[in-house]
Amino acid sequence: MRIRISTYSLVVGLALCAIAGCNTGTDQNGPGTEQPVTSLRRGNGGDPGTLDPSLAEDVHAFNVLRDLYEGLVTEAPDGSIVPGVASDWEISKDGLRYTFNLRDTALWSNGDPVTARDFAAGIRRVLSPGSQSSYAFLLYPLLNAREVIESRESIDKLGVRAIDENTLEVELYAPAGHFLSVLAMPVAFPIHNSMGGEERSFADPAYFIGNGAYMLDEWRPGSVIRLRKNPRFRDAVNVSIQVVEYFPIVDSMTELNMYRAGELDITATIPPSMFEPLRAERPSEVRIAPSLALYYVALDLSESPMNIPMLRQALSLAIDREKLVEIVGRGEKPAYGIVPDGVAGYRGARYDWQHLSPAERESRANEAYLNAGYNDDNPLKFKLIYDTGDIHETVALTLAAMWEAVLGAQVVLDKREWQYFLETRS
């Protein structure tokens, strides 16, 4: 049996930023004159699994896709939802129907107009039967979404339609206050009608067509993803950075050293041991902000014994979350629910044992472990699969130690490169 650690993101966003260190080209205005930033070099922690917005599922891809595409709506720096390709929208009084009016100035990078049909096509692609999208569930508020993806309804019954070239209508089966936020995510991005047939369309600049502030200029896996400003972007006049480069550096210390050497302008993978020293060394450059994200362990429920609820409860109870975030040491918060704290308007359920003492929690973990049929004479044995990178290794080693110490479980650690991790995790 196997369980795996998600590598999508952590509960707290963390970065070092030194925009003044960006490469600005030749100084044509003499010494002492501040030059505009024309390029940006970012550490990305790894290569994207894909740049197909319908199939992307990792933070490495999401970082790049936000530059390559623009959704109907987008997020402002303060987290609020603001117009994107849609100039405005109306929501019916019952909260079930959204009507979006698209800007006629929105163009694809090849010059074609971005239409309501392109957005409808992207959403239908995600929810088509047999879809491999890991984030299709985010679109389940759409009318008949579950029925369509499970082949119980035809795709034309899905709650999305283009009324005309510049008007998109979306219908929900029940009100969903968060739905506008979903539409800012890659899973709801438009798809050009020439894309989607082959994977190379999303990896080769010769085929790639996007509608964002940047175009794909080069992708050398394991080396760099280079983007160039899209002159046809609807708001190109306000895009001052001409080139953005993403470097897939797996080792966080290597990435930090590149940042310190001036070879990167942003790094978001600070090694745990360096967090406090860096806050003292570069207080103006360390940025910490809440992030709508979760670091979690995914279980393979298709086979025994991980399909036994009592065993899953034992594994969860055995984790000392307070200790875990202390070991990781980058300002994360313990996660006691699926939705992180701080989400506006959300008051989620919490474990009833959240405030137990460590001894009480471990006692309940052992009780659940015994009730699941395991003990010292019959210990649980399983494999924990995790992505490369010292954060993930730290978490994996800590979890394995906790399960062994509290329950007596025997854990085999299996570290895999990110792409191989994606290909072999099912």
Each model region followed by its residue ranges:
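Alpha-helical secondary-structure segments
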Residues: T115-G122, E165-E171, G212-A213, I241-V243, ...
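Aromatic- and charge-enriched surface segment that lines or borders ligand/interaction sites
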Residues: S87-Y135, E169, M258, P305
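N-terminal lobe/hinge region of extracytoplasmic solute-binding protein
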Residues: G43-K93, R124, S131, Y207-G210
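Short, well-ordered beta-strand elements
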Residues: P36-G49, S87, R97-F100, F119-G122, ...
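Gly/Pro-rich hinge or "lid" segments in bacterial periplasmic/extracellular proteins
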Residues: L143-A145, S151-D156, R161, N166, ...
